[in-house]
Amino acid sequence: MPKMKTSRAAAKRFKVTGTGKLKRNKAYKRHILTKKTTKTKRNLRKATMTDETNVKNMKKILPYM
């Protein structure tokens, strides 16, 4: 059986934690920031875990992570 290919786009966007969960950065922090509150922008800085409903698909496109 041939090797599975890792999705390079996904590999650059996700990291695996020590417990095996997928960590990701939040969206909506690139532009049009003037209308967003300071609190919103501060909360967007923090990384978060990938939702459990998406983990199965993410593991499929990231076979070696």
UniProtKB/Swiss-Prot annotation:
InterPro entries: Ribosomal_bL35, Ribosomal_bL35-like, Ribosomal_bL35_CS, Ribosomal_bL35_sf. One of its GO terms (molecular function) is structural constituent of ribosome. Keywords: Ribonucleoprotein, Ribosomal protein. GO terms for cellular component: cytosolic large ribosomal subunit. One of its GO terms (biological process) is translation. It holds the Pfam family Ribosomal_L35p. SUPFAM superfamilies: L35p-like (SSF143034). The keyword Glycoprotein does not apply. The keyword S-adenosyl-L-methionine does not apply. Belongs to the bacterial ribosomal protein bL35 family. This is Large ribosomal subunit protein bL35. The gene is rpmI.
